[in-house]
Amino acid sequence: MAGRGGRDPRRGYDGGYGYPRGGGGQGGTNRGRDGQRGGGRNGPRGGRFPGGRGVEPRRGGDVLGGGQGGGRGTTAGAGGLVRGGSELAVGAELRRRVPTCHVNDFPELGIGGTPVLVRRWRPRDHRDQHDHQSQRHHHRHHHHQRQRHHHHHQRQQRRGSRTRDPRVRRGPLRIPYGEDEKEEPPATPIASSNKNKREEPPTKHRPMARPPGGGGPLSKGEVKLLVNHFSVDYPKESTFFHYEIRIKLGDGPNRKLSKAELLTVKNELFEHESLQELSSAVAYDGERNLYTCAELPEDCIVPVSKFRVKDSSRTYIVSVKLKKPLPLSQLLEQRPGPRDVMQGLDVIVREASSFGKIVLGQGFYPQSGSEAISDSNIVALKGTQQSLKCTQKGLILCVDYSVLPCWKAGSVLDLVKTMKFMEYPLLEDQLKKLNNALKGLCVTVSHRKTEEKYTVKGLTDKPADQITFKDSKSGQTTKLIEYYKETYKKEIEHPMLPCLDLSKSKSKQNYVPIEFCNIPEGERYPVARLDDKKSDNKGEQEKPSTKTTLRKISIKVASSRKEEILDLVGNAQDGPCRGKIAQRFRISLDAAMMEVTGRILAPPTLELGTGTSRGQTFKFTIHQDDCQWNWKLKKYDKRVVAHGGTLNCWGVVDFSEGDLESKFIDKVVRKCSALGMVMTRKPCYEHVSNMEVLSDPKSLRDALIEAKRAAEEEDKKLQLLFCPMLNRCHGYKTLKLMCETELGIQTQCFLSTAAKLDEKRQDQYITNLALKINGKIGGSNMQLDPDSIPVVSAKDFMFIGADVNHPPPGNVSKDIPSIAAVVASVDKGASKYVTRIRAQYHRCEMIQNLGDICKELIGAYEKVNKKKPDSIIYFRDGVSDGQFDMVLNEELADMENKIMVGDYPKITVIVAKKRHHTRLFPKDRNQRQTKNGNVLPGTVVDTDVVDPTAYDFYLCSHKGEVGTSRPTHYYSLLDEHGFASDDLQKLVYNLCFVFARCTKPVSLATPVYYADLAAYRGRLYYEGMMMLQPAASAASASEAMMPAAQPQAAAAAAAAASPSSSAASSSEGMTASQPQAPAAEAASSSAGAADFRELPPMHGDLLNNMFFL
């Protein structure tokens, strides 16, 4: 590639580079139009000619053109890297300094590599004044060449004496190119007098280490705590042995073996007389890894052996080989311990804890601990959730009390009988209900000798006695009933019932009669299917719902939960790390919980309105231990929202069929006015409807359009609709979809039963509705005082929260997308947020095109504040420890590349984790605690039970009303602001106080909480879209979900996005960029790209509102 001319007045540069497999080519002297390269040819394996000199000035700017570029390519993919990139061109405003680097620094550019990103320094304008003024008037080539060599020497001198801020990140340099931005590959410097000096290759971001010192001065007291972490004792001088075991079929088609088959073969192997003594000294992970406490005899293990399993006609080929010894002394020498040693210990502890238990993920449930739920097909398994960790105090096992709803083990036919579906023929509604109940269920079959599990895809359209198929051997059409009779000697006793579809592929159907299918022990029951309805049989006492019964079993107050955990750990028979395996490996568990010292952070100062004049604020600090406050007026103050929104036109569509008390809406309106909102007293539209209209998309759309039309006839714009409902309904999803994406109307839904609450509870309910309404119409309920925002309050700061909502567990279809949501604050009080939602690939955790999303959010911030933020605190939710690298080196890198303009903002990255099982308990009754025995809000732990090297802490920011409080586990992955431990913990805690819907701190920092709500709103949009197309065939639906492919990647796919989380939430900007499929995903996808439907764009009127509240 020939040398490029300078690209724009600010970041022009001369010198060119060759792309991999490109090469210098014969450079041209053409004008570098808008930064395009000069003419010339590209050699197929590096150019044969050096790049020419771009002597023409770039059109449109006082920038001199390319200079010497390209270079003589000598190897494939290396052409064009000899000269160029280190050269500088002078821009009209600002010259960008580019560090030099060598070709040898980037071995990945050998053949067909991708351009490598170079390091960057922050630009320093004052150093460029002389260069700028001295070069801008020289346009002839020989003057430009002399200037370049002169300033290159000056640059080298300055660079040698320049000191770097150690907190400055290294990352890719982005240079604007017209409307778009492209990356600058590295280039080799011109020969220097000091050949040994060169830049290091770019390094990846790593999670930051814990800074020296700790928190303390800002806390209001200490508290003694117990943590459900139990110390693990292991033989520190011993060595375990890691073996690789491979098992495959010796005859028949080669297929992936199930875990049950692998475990059976492994057990059979150690029944061999020479290995029998070691059968209790082996831990197996169910795949390829085997761990032993002693080395296996060499004369007993051969590289490959064949044998048959008892009661099976199949032959298996097994190979076992030593991978490496694992000295446990390494756990003392390295913190955290080496990954392979920790993985081995984890497998050993799991194996030592699983005897006689049903193991599901990290859950261990003794079969003796099940509790049947009356009048249902569900049982509750009581057990533990366990995870092995390395902490500052050493190796520990985190053990938590757990209850798992499971199907009652037995025949699927018994399940059908309890549903009273044994009559023939099944009605359409019965067939649909049975299909929904069984779809996704894992079953075993009784007509064949196998323990393999099959997933139910659905039911057949016809009963068993009407199903026929073509025999692949004879080519004749055979009845299913006759096939089972002849092949398996089985009579089908219920031919009127449909069969279960257990097919693993569309090409090979597998229909099995219901009576030959069984539900195994420990088959998880989907929580989403739990019944909320209570028994309403006349003459019988009202029975609690299944969900209510399970909640009573699973939710324990702190003291009861602590006792349950201690009982489970101390159980000699069913406790963790028990039995022969634990004895042979000499691993044991301390029966006492670990004791730590926590600190209680002081609550922040909040700002409210005074109700006297706009802009005047009232500051107050919460003094109650539970950190709750209210809006009740006192003689000496008047508490109103910090900024009241304006609601000029609102209406009511009553889906409760007039069941709502007539004065309830009026009470809401008066409460809104009392809290400082500007709201008209009378609605501009009222209509009484019913739940049938809400459930029918066509009728619902007509009702909503009529409401909007009625407002327009009065020359008003409908802003909000109150929508009372009799009960929760799926029509809620289509209501939100239509109003927020088609019509641009905010909605406030609530149950009509709220009007029947007692006066005190009703007033609280109405207040919460008013707070939600104010947030939706652009108001601000409460704000943080600047003194409560450490370090960044004096700057233009932005808080960003991001989360991804995935399809629920057990979902069979891979066409269902994951929903990503990103929110960002736009005010100094950290209370107003804007949102962007995107749909992306199924179960893809990395947020696609995060940089483009953040660019939009910064644009919204700039629109409000007339300037861009110079400090960003990025909160990320829902990622595991193993995905920290993805957050830092993919999401963060994408963000930096897109938002970097001049001096990019400083960034701090914080991950919030709620899906863990660490619990904090007051040591005794003398410790400060809530009324129900939970730790107080603001309790933070950052010693002993935290990561030995990472910068993390546990923060319990909320008052646990029910059960045991779960602290949030925060990790600081990157900190360019230099927060002290106290400052960072205080910032996170204080952000929990500005959640718009309540007057108490929430369990999660507000930016993350909002992202969670917004992502969940996107999930509702998607489900609402699917409800609007019930008649679409599978083929047409699949075709509709296929986005257009990107021209540069066969597997690239279009994507819009959407939110993720837990309550009503929503977002905007879903029409933006379309992400490109990850390479690995594209290669493995049989469908081509990504199978998901784009979400509709958010209506422009709601684009920057907090509609998700």
UniProtKB/Swiss-Prot annotation:
SMART domains membership: DUF1785, Piwi
Q: Example GO molecular function term?
A: RNA endonuclease activity
Q: Which residues form the Piwi domain?
A: 720-1023
GO term, biological process aspect, one: regulatory ncRNA-mediated gene silencing
Q: Does the keyword Cytoplasm apply?
A: no
Amino acid composition bias (Gly residues), ranges on this chain: 14-30, 37-54, 62-83
What domain of life is recorded for the organism?
Answer: Eukaryota
Q: Where does this protein have compositionally biased stretches of type Basic and acidic residues?
A: 1-13, 125-134, 527-545
| Chain intervals with Basic residues compositional bias | 135-161
Q: Which PANTHER family match?
A: EUKARYOTIC TRANSLATION INITIATION FACTOR 2C
Q: What is this protein called?
A: Protein argonaute 3
Could you tell me which species this protein originates from? Oryza sativa subsp. japonica
Q: What is the lineage of its organism?
A: Eukaryota, Viridiplantae, Streptophyta, Embryophyta, Tracheophyta
Q: Which gene encodes it?
A: AGO3
